[in-house]
Curated annotation (Swiss-Prot):
It comes from Campylobacter jejuni subsp. jejuni serotype O:2 (strain ATCC 700819 / NCTC 11168). A divalent metal cation 2 binds at residues 190, 221, 312. Keywords: Hydrolase, Metal-binding. A divalent metal cation 1 binds at residues 158, 160, 190, 314. This is Uncharacterized metallophosphoesterase Cj0846. InterPro entries: Calcineurin-like_PHP_ApaH (IPR004843), Metallo-depent_PP-like (IPR029052), Metallophosphoesterase_sf (IPR051158). It is an enzyme of class 3 (hydrolase). Belongs to the metallophosphoesterase superfamily. One of its GO terms (cellular component) is membrane. Gene3D superfamilies: 3.60.21.10.
Length: 374
């Protein structure tokens, strides 16, 4: 039911946006004067593609190729909507400036129209490319008083391996991570976003991450959506990652723990169990907690940990959704102080969810340079 309501709202928003763009932008552009019927057809196809993607995106019968193509059809509407707002704003300014020479107005209008078309094409390309490209590397220094030696950690979240991001994306991600020569790699949830059996042929490539202490993994909410036990079986069988589900590992100089995701509370499987983790936690040593959703820090007392690592938010992924994410999660992206001792880093993620769109929320591979207090 929630999925149906969500789908209806999204389609209503994009349907109205398409109508607004066509009536307020396309039909007003002089350069498109003889192509209105063609654009009418284009916008009908655009909306139908958006509807098909939204309705069937969870369907196994939608091939990877069609999924990738349909996921791009949201970018034109999104970008053109803001271009239309800009168009209406400029027209308002010109109206307030009063009457001018007709020739001057026509030249000015044509220049603006041409600029708008070029900018729209660029924005559509950039928003799709920002989602699909290999993430950039971001370096963050974090001071941890109890840490006995410096540590370089690569943090990955929200890779979302599935119908849109698959083997080729993972290969590039691994190559870029290995160039950083990390001491350890942590994957903080939403690694898998499809039926686990679809990843069987290449999921073992996760073993190609090279680091001193290995790769550590905690659950995300999307793993629950695709059969949490099947996901865990796949990862345990085909990878050598250290899977932390309400578990703490003592590495000698540091403790690293992984908490079950909040999605487990609704499903009654692998729900967060902080008490279980704290049984083995040595609070006199440096410690890291992997927990996918940052709002965990608002629901649980995490003050025993030095560093909490989260993802889930995608940095908002699409402007202006970062403001809604802030309301829902309490945190969006970056380094936060949770108290005297505890710090939280929320990553914008390596992949994306839903439409192939990232606007003002770039993906990232995070290098955490942990330094003991000198």
């Amino acid at each position: 039911m929630i999925f149906l309501i969500f789908s209806f709202i999204v389609l209503l928003i994009f349907g109205l946006a398409n109508v607004y763009i066509y009536k307020r932008l396309i039909k007003k552009i002089t350069l498109f004067k003889y192509f209105y019927k063609i654009f009418s057809f284009i916008f009908i196809v655009l909306f139908l593609a958006q509807a098909v993607f939204l309705i069937f995106r969870r369907d196994e019968y939608l091939s990877d190729t069609w999924y990738e193509i349909l996921a791009m059809f949201y970018a034109p509407t999104y970008c053109l909507f803001f271009m239309t707002l800009a168009w209406d704003f400029v027209k308002l300014i010109l109206a307030l400036m009063g009457k001018r020479d007709k020739t001057y107005n026509l030249i000015l209008r044509l220049i603006f129209e041409l600029s708008l078309i070029v900018l729209s094409v660029f924005l559509i390309y950039a928003s799709i490319n920002n989602a699909l490209k290999t993430p950039e590397v971001k370096s963050v220094d974090v001071e941890i008083p109890n840490l006995k030696k410096d540590l370089k950690i690569v943090m990955l979240t929200d890779i979302h391996l599935g119908k849109n991001l698959h083997e080729n994306f993972l290969d590039k991600l691994i190559t870029k991570v290995n160039l950083q020569s990390p001491d350890m790699v942590v994957i903080v949830g939403d690694l898998i976003d499809t039926n686990p059996k679809d990843l069987k042929n290449y999921i073992s490539k996760l073993n190609d991450f090279n680091s001193t202490y290995g790769t550590f993994y905690a659950l995300g909410n999307h793993e629950y959506y695709h059969g949490i036990n099947e996901v865990l079986d796949l990862l345990r069988k085909h990878t050598n990652m250290k899977i932390l589900v309400n578990q703490n590992l003592d590495l000698g100089f540091i403790d690293i723990a992984g908490l079950g995701d909040l999605a487990g509370l609704d499903r009654g499987l692998y729900a967060p169990d902080l008490a279980r983790i704290k049984v083995d936690l040595n609070t006199s040593k440096a410690s890291i907690l992997l927990t996918h959703q940052p709002k965990t820090a608002l629901l649980y007392d995490l003050s025993d940990f030095d560093l909490v690592l989260s993802g889930h938010t995608h940095g908002g992924q699409i402007f202006p959704f970062m403001f809604l994410v802030k309301l829902q999660q309490g945190f969006v992206h970056g380094l936060y102080d949770l108290g005297e001792k505890t710090k939280l880093y929320v990553s914008s993620g390596a992949g994306f969810w839903g439409p192939s769109l990232r606007v003002f929320a770039p993906s990232e591979i995070v290098i955490l340079n942990l330094k003991g207090k000198k």
